[in-house]
Curated annotation (Swiss-Prot):
Residues involved in Ca(2+) binding: 20, 52-53, 321
Annotated segments matching region N-domain: 12-189
Predominant location: endoplasmic reticulum
Residue numbers spanned by region C-domain: 302-389
Annotated signal sequence range: 1-13
Descriptive protein name: Calreticulin
Stretches the record annotates as P-domain: 190-301
Name of the gene: CRT
GO biological process, one term: protein folding
Induction of the gene: Up-regulated during the early stages (30 min-2 hours) of the development of amoebic liver abscess in the host followed by a rapid decrease to basal expression level.
GO cellular component assignments: cell surface; cytosol; endoplasmic reticulum; endoplasmic reticulum lumen; endoplasmic reticulum membrane; phagocytic cup; uropod
Cysteine disulfide links: 96-130
UniProt family annotation: Belongs to the calreticulin family.
Length: 389
């Protein structure tokens, strides 16, 4: 029976969207966002694993990039795996900008050009970098609310391509991979605040009035030293002298400046000691939440119809490529293997380019130093000739 079910599942496995960017015909820029959009370009990039492989690149700094494409067909992931996978390169050396994608239901927009940052989406997935923050977003919409994953998933921020994979299973579990390596996995009801909490504070219990939660107290045996408050904060500078040119009649009576008193110790405070009555931090007793109801279909969306890119980039140059949306894990893994091999070749080319640039810079530096040395010798020679004359 299981074998039959497996064969049926494999035979019905489908690819709903596969974009390798031979062109950008599927992608329509937003005309409804009200923002000044930067243009996308189809490029191979400065370094690549295959010169014939293209991607969709952001091309102008400090611009929004908002475009959408229609999936090959509308579908629901009910009772099926959902795999969202794509290759992304921050070729520009990202400092602040996103590289994520959004999956939208049919009801969200009438057509691709109607896509805006406010359009409702089912899932937002992918890297987002700004300053020290480098995270992979996995935002799930549930009953109209966008829920951020509670776990932190670091993203890659260098200038080579990385493959991002999100797997959602019909048992309410998920996996996030980067470059084929699992970075996070878990359960929907544990890693997102989609449902009401399973337990809540018992409303019939309050912290006892005599509960002591102060760890330390003032030492009752510590006394303020006599004369403590008599020490002034400032004193007359003993090294100050009235200027010889000072005239009391013209300048007024001279007053020596004051300085901070090295003997002054500030406000006296008694020493602190452990509180013998301390009971520890009071923990509110928990009870089962009567509003908690488990949803076995947290993973499920009735409609996937569009994919959108909606990012702001301070520094442009990000390249999207190899976007795959399918319910076939084997198909995604097969494609990932090819992409990762190509990414390895891309890294090799990038390293060779960087090494050549480094050598060129070093040679230019040596040439400049040599030139400066020759100029110095020439100056010395000129000075010597002047002295002889």
């Amino acid at each position: 029976m299981f074998t039959l079910f497996l064969l049926i599942a494999l035979s019905s496995a489908k690819v709903y969207f596969h974009e390798t960017f031979e062109n950008r015909d599927k992608w329509i820029d937003s005309t409804s966002s009200g923002k000044a959009l930067g243009p996308f370009k189809i490029v191979s990039g400065k370094w690549y694993g295959d010169a014939n492989n293209k991607g969709l690149q952001t091309s102008e700094d400090n611009k929004f990039y908002i475009a959408a494409a229609k999936l090959d067909e509308e579908f629901s992931n009910k009772d099926k795996n959902l795999i969202v996978q794509y290759n992304l390169k921050f070729e520009q050396g990202i400092d602040c900008g996103g590289g994520y994608i959004k999956l939208l239901p049919k009801k969200s927009i009438e057509s691709e050009e109607k896509f805006t940052p406010e359009s409702e989406y089912n899932i937002m997935f992918g890297p987002d970098v700004c300053g020290g923050s480098k995270r992979t977003h996995v935002i799930m919409n549930y009953k109209g609310k966008n829920n951020l994953i509670r776990k932190e998933i670091k993203c890659e921020s260098d200038d080579i391509s990385h493959l991002y994979t999100l797997i959602i299973r019909p048992n309410n579990t998920y996996v996030v991979k980067i470059d084929g390596v699992e970075k996070q996995e878990g359960k929907f009801d544990e890693d997102w605040d989609m449902l009401a909490p399973k337990e809540i504070d018992d409303p019939n219990v309050s912290k006892p009035a005599d509960w002591v939660d102060e760890k330390e107290i003032d030492d009752p045996n510590d006394k303020k030293p006599e004369g403590w408050d008599d020490i002034p904060k400032t004193i007359v500078d003993p090294n100050a002298k009235k200027p010889e040119e000072w005239n009391d009649e013209d300048d007024g009576e001279w007053e020596a400046p004051t300085i901070e008193n090295p003997e002054y110790k500030g406000e006296w405070k008694p020493k602190r000691i452990p509180n013998p009555a301390y009971k520890g931090e009071w923990v509110h007793p928990q009870i089962a939440n009567p509003d908690y109801v488990y949803d076995p279909e947290l993973y499920k969306y009735d409609s996937f119809a569009y994919i959108g890119i909606d990012v702001w980039q301070v520094k442009a140059g990000t390249i999207y490529d190899d976007i795959l949306i399918t319910d076939d894990i084997e198909e995604a893994e097969k494609e990932a293997k090819v992409i990762l091999e190509r990414n390895a070749a891309e890294k090799k080319m990038r390293d060779e380019i960087k090494e050549a640039e480094k050598q060129k810079e070093e040679e230019a530096k040596k040439e400049a130093e040599k030139q400066k040395e020759e100029e110095t010798k020439e100056e010395i020679k000129k000075e010597e000739n002047k002295e002889e004359l």
